[in-house]
Amino acid sequence: MAASLVRSCCSRASRAITTVRFMSNVPEDTVYGGPKPQNSNQRVTLTQLRQKHRKGEPITMVTAYDYPSAVHIDTAGIDVCLVGDSAAMVVHGYDTTLPISLEEMLVHCRAVARGAKRPLLVGDLPFGTYESSTNQAVDTAVRVLKEGGMDAIKLEGGSPSRITAAKSIVEAGIAVMGHVGLTPQAISVLGGFRPQGKNIASAVKVVETAMALQEAGCFSVVLECVPPPVAAAATSALNIPTIGIGAGPFCSGQVLVYHDLLGMMQHPHHAKVTPKFCKQYAQVGEVINKALLEYKEEVSKHLFPGPSHSPYKISSSDLDGFLSELQKLGLDKAASDAAASAEKMDHSDSPSSQ
């Protein structure tokens, strides 16, 4: 009896140890200790971005503003999805990024969060929502995460107040991406959408600002529209990844605006041409225009919808009853038109008409 009990206890202990060993092979992703199974669709983390950076593997980032664009970015396996305030221009049609509000940005953030399950999600802090005080900056960042479903925020510029804002947001436990060089929210100071770092003082300022953002705790810095040597210097000087847009090939990663890289807006009213730094990987705008023109033509010529796109049927007996009810209501013409349409659809469906 005692020997049997010992064997039973040992057997249960062995199974328990086996279970523990098996589960310990799965990485623990939270401080609460719940081991999670590895999943190819698991959200990209800051740790993974740092690992890519250390290995010298380029980081990919693309903007998204709604559910469909987020799904496409998710499917492509892009590392980071930025809900940019560029939505003001490419979605809302403004000339600059300045008019978009926090409430509008939150709508975009929520839509993207529903569509992009894998990329790290970064939301821009729109102009006027973080400049007045550190409290305002932290409150806005909290809303972008809690209400927008983002994983991190991005803010522009490197003035002392922006550096302080970045530091305060990081201290509040929120990951921050910085942005230097051409900062669209500062176009009134910069004199328009102009490249930065083209002279000694400006180039040094780009590098120093990027370093200050790193010191403030930013996990990454966007370098926009600066000469490649300046971007290379900033990338070398930093321990965090740089993400270039119009900054040459020497950054830790690259970002482009969704609409620009897909060629969706051949003649945007806010720019004479697509930005010089942007490669168009498709001409989606032409495809859209062609499809819309074809649709318009087919509807105008009564070619759409045809039988193949009119799938819902009514039985002959129900049709007869329906026509009878129309006649009782005094809708003789409606009954006649309904009967004629049914006859026409039957003729279209017959083998001889195929």
UniProtKB/Swiss-Prot annotation:
Q: Where is the active site?
A: E224
Q: What is this protein called?
A: 3-methyl-2-oxobutanoate hydroxymethyltransferase 2, mitochondrial
Record lineage:
Eukaryota, Viridiplantae, Streptophyta, Embryophyta, Tracheophyta
MF annotations from Gene Ontology: 3-methyl-2-oxobutanoate hydroxymethyltransferase activity; cobalt ion binding; zinc ion binding
The superkingdom listed in its UniProt entry is Eukaryota
Family recorded in the similarity comment: Belongs to the PanB family.
> What's its EC?
2.1.2.11
Question: Where do the annotations place 3-methyl-2-oxobutanoate binding?
Answer: D85, S86, D124, K154
Binding residue positions for Mg(2+): D85, D124, E156
Q: Transit peptide located at which residues? A: 1-50
Q: Which reaction does it catalyse?
A: 3-methyl-2-oxobutanoate + (6R)-5,10-methylene-5,6,7,8-tetrahydrofolate + H2O = 2-dehydropantoate + (6S)-5,6,7,8-tetrahydrofolate
Listed under GO biological process in this entry are: pantothenate biosynthetic process
The record's listing under Pfam families reads: Pantoate_transf (PF02548)
Listed under GO cellular component are: mitochondrion
- Return the cofactor note field: Binds 1 Mg(2+) ion per subunit.
